[in-house]
């Protein structure tokens, strides 16, 4: 894919940051010395970590140069590193590995979570959240449009590249032997957005990218036209004209 767009991502900053706040609230650390924000994006989640633990050394890592540029502008004086978590080795003295909405993009992420949790010292925490929305209309219709147009062959891999998350028990069984305690839960958010066009704008920043990034400009326009029409049919307006984007998310907090 092309580089991530921080500007597009931040169009829904409050809604995207809310799961980070909810994840942060469940972390039982009073004074960690070193905190790493994995997949820090434009620094909105990193900012929460800095606010909660101002005395800690907080580091952000991401693969996107544009996201890292925005993070450095947001939090000057903090360290942000361009790195792929699949090949990244955490510092031996890290007390917290925090990951908001990143591991759904990482191949074989359950094995990666085991590796990272196993690298933490006793009492260290791995806290992560992933969208669990591939069965939601917003994402089902991406795959439907990918399979139905003249681009179907080019988009075939993108349409099947992401699998549904494993059942919660699979995460429990994989991580429990590596930690003293583990908490696993789902939260379903219902984001009130202005209209169905806002839903399309939301997913342009994340879920749509593996599809539209492979298309030529005119094809991209046609794909988005068809996708937008399907979204408009699937999400009916509320009494005030807004639409509710149902968004399930999966959380894990594991204490080494």
Curated annotation (Swiss-Prot):
GO process terms (BP): methylation
Enzyme class at the top of the EC tree: transferase
Record keywords, A-Z: Cytoplasm, Methyltransferase, S-adenosyl-L-methionine, Transferase
Principal location: cytoplasm
Domain of life: Bacteria
Catalytic activity: trans-aconitate + S-adenosyl-L-methionine = (E)-3-(methoxycarbonyl)pent-2-enedioate + S-adenosyl-L-homocysteine
MF GO annotations: trans-aconitate 2-methyltransferase activity
A Pfam cross-reference name: Methyltransf_25
Function: Catalyzes the S-adenosylmethionine monomethyl esterification of trans-aconitate.
HAMAP family in alphabetical order: Tran_acon_Me_trans (MF_00560)
Matching PANTHER family: TRANS-ACONITATE 2-METHYLTRANSFERASE (PTHR43861:SF1), TRANS-ACONITATE 2-METHYLTRANSFERASE-RELATED (PTHR43861)
Family to which the UniProt record says this protein belongs: Belongs to the methyltransferase superfamily. Tam family.
Name listed for the protein in its UniProt record: Trans-aconitate 2-methyltransferase
Originating species: Nitrobacter winogradskyi (strain ATCC 25391 / DSM 10237 / CIP 104748 / NCIMB 11846 / Nb-255)
Gene (name only): tam
């Amino acid at each position: 894919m092309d580089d991530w767009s921080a500007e597009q991502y931040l169009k829904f900053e409050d809604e995207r940051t809310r799961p980070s706040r909810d994840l942060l609230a469940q972390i039982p650390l009073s004074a960690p010395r070193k905190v790493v924000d994995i997949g820090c994006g434009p620094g909105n989640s990193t900012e929460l970590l800095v606010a909660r633990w101002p005395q800690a050394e907080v580091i952000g890592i991401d693969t996107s140069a544009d996201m890292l540029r925005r993070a450095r502008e947001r939090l000057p004086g903090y360290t942000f590193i361009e790195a792929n978590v699949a090949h990244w080795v955490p510092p031996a003295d890290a007390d917290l590995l925090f990951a908001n909405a990143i591991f759904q993009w990482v191949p074989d992420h359950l094995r990666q979570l085991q590796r990272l949790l196993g690298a933490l010292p006793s009492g260290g925490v791995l806290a992560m959240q992933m969208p669990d929305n591939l069965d939601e209309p917003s994402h089902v219709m991406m795959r439907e449009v990918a399979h139905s147009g003249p681009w179907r062959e080019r988009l075939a891999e993108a349409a099947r590249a992401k699998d549904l998350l494993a059942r919660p028990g699979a995460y429990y069984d994989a991580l429990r032997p590596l930690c003293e305690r583990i908490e696993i839960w789902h939260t379903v958010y219902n984001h009130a957005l202005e209209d169905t066009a806002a839903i399309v704008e939301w997913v342009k920043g994340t879920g749509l990218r593996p599809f539209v990034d492979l298309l030529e400009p005119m094809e991209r326009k046609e794909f988005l036209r068809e996708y937008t029409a399907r979204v408009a049919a699937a999400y009916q307006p509320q009494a005030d004209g807004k639409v509710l984007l149902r968004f399930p998310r999966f959380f894990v907090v594991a204490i080494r």
